Amino acid sequence: MDSDTCTVPDHFLPRKLSKQNLDRFIPNRSAMDFDFANYALTQGRKRNVDEITSASRKAYMTQLAVVMNQNRTRILAFRNKPKALLSSNHSDSPHQNPKSVKPRRYIPQNSERVLDAPGLMDDFYLNLLDWGSANVLAIALGDTVYLWDASSGSTSELVTIDEDKGPVTSINWTQDGLDLAVGLDNSEVQLWDFVSNRQVRTLIGGHESRVGSLAWNNHILTTGGMDGKIVNNDVRIRSSIVGTYLGHTEEVCGLKWSESGKKLASGGNYNVVHIWDHRSVASSKPTRQWLHRFEEHTAAVRALAWCPFQATLLATGGGVGDGKIKFWNTHTGACLNSVETGSQVCSLLWSQRERELLSSHGFTQNQLTLWKYPSMSKMAELNGHTSRVLFMAQSPNGCTVASAAGDENLRLWNVFGEPPKTTKKAASKNYLELFSHVNSLR
């Protein structure tokens, strides 16, 4: 071996790197707080020293530690939910419960069922749909009245009127839902017992032309005719006519007794609404002594609805050329509010549980509109009908609404929410599956 030459072991030679200009890795510790880390470690080694500390001071120190040492925990560490700090706002006392905010109710935009209703008359002055308290829905199609028992899901034909007497121009259930009054084009009114499916009696002599509106008040059946007369019939006695109201000069197209039975609202073709006193029901002579006369509408008034939570409040809706919903104090006669809807108001229904009002309309949208009362802000618009929605009826539980229109369709809407939990199961069968086995009313 040459003395001037030295062999260097391979492990002392520098490694051949694939990349050049590399340096050692120096981590960035700017986000690391070594002072706090040292404090946290050393504090844990200190012996606990017993000292007298008040409860308030302990609470203060705990909250101060939370504030000063926030975000100094391990990432994704499992720990208990942090305690809420006391608010600095003295009005938010721990003894006061925060005001609960009621969640907004979901309102389905589509109808639950759609049925064909061939022969349904497209006449603004008639009343051809009613849902009784016995859970039976009645609808008049031409000369025939059909019934749907929602409790059993069965359908039946109640009566077909002779051609010389028909068509049927109005229907209305008694308050117990066991008997149905049927107004006819020839001025007669028939009373039918749907349980036995037989006619009980016929009322004649009260009108000179068709009977387009009916309203029950216990044993009194009030009828409104094209002749402008409103007739009170006591169905318990042979000579049933016990009183007549005179105030409308044209057809009476809307009648509604208040829930207490003390006041009657009537709407007519001559843009007038009258409020009548029940004490003048039985009068030996026709009376023109109404309590109030409202003339603010500019079109026929068919839509009438007494408020269920305020006995003296009445909502009315005007037809084509008016399109307004008005609210009246029937004690003072004052108009409380007037809302422009933009289209013919055909029918009105109050919610039985919420402060809400449902209206049905004509051209251009033929929609149902749900309003929040008293702000009258729109909660929902329900579309589906292609012609004016003339008739609406509410189920006994107050949740489902049936609507019938000039397009010869009957639709069911779950617009007023779910039924109470105690009846939810039964209601689901009774209302949502009411027409599951039929597609047509005939």
Curated annotation (Swiss-Prot):
GO CC entries: cytoplasm
PROSITE patterns found in the cross-reference section: WD_REPEATS_1 (PS00678), WD_REPEATS_2 (PS50082), WD_REPEATS_REGION (PS50294)
Region (Disordered): 85-104
SMART domains per UniProt: WD40
Molecular function per GO: anaphase-promoting complex binding; ubiquitin-protein transferase activator activity
Compositional bias segments (type: Polar residues): 86-99
Alphabetical UniProt keywords: Cell cycle, Cell division, Cytoplasm, Mitosis, Repeat, Ubl conjugation pathway, WD repeat
Predominant location: cytoplasm
Membrane-spanning intervals of the chain: none
Per-repeat ranges for WD: 121-158, 163-202, 206-243, 247-286, 296-338, 340-381, 384-423
Compartment(s): Cytoplasm
GO biological process: cell division; protein ubiquitination
Superkingdom, taxonomy of origin: Eukaryota
Pathway named in the protein's UniProt entry: Protein modification; protein ubiquitination
Family: Belongs to the WD repeat CDC20/Fizzy family.
Subunit architecture: The APC/C is composed of at least 11 subunits that stay tightly associated throughout the cell cycle.
Function, in words: Component of the anaphase promoting complex/cyclosome (APC/C), a cell cycle-regulated E3 ubiquitin-protein ligase complex that controls progression through mitosis and the G1 phase of the cell cycle.
Protein name: Cell division cycle 20.3, cofactor of APC complex
Organism of provenance: Arabidopsis thaliana
